[in-house]
């Protein structure tokens, strides 16, 4: 027991835990008969949380696709912060970066400059169309962006179009 609570009770509580939507929620999806891990981290983004998300994505099955919307509240350093996370994604072996937003284009440019695939969508329907072209080859997809970008629309479109889904307790599983 721990703190007077039985381990069985703790295990039961942890096994019923469901992460909050948009906060590193891992979902096992089937796309055209292939398993894909989708991580919905669409609720918010800043340079530190994007780097942490990239670290998480790197641990999941490859090939990796990072769908990144603009990070908000970055002030005058917005372009450089976005370049930095694009470079970090490339340095961590993220094979494909798909961006959405005026500032996220700097992430795609830096990722592409490091000899990795980086694409920039003009709007979320175009981002979804581009992502559909990547999904047949993806092992894991992580969606991240600041709240105002509405990146959850990409997650919802993917879940709606998937052959099937299953919530996972943690992204590591």
Mark where each language-model region is.
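ATP-dependent carboxylate-amine ligase
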Residues: 1-173
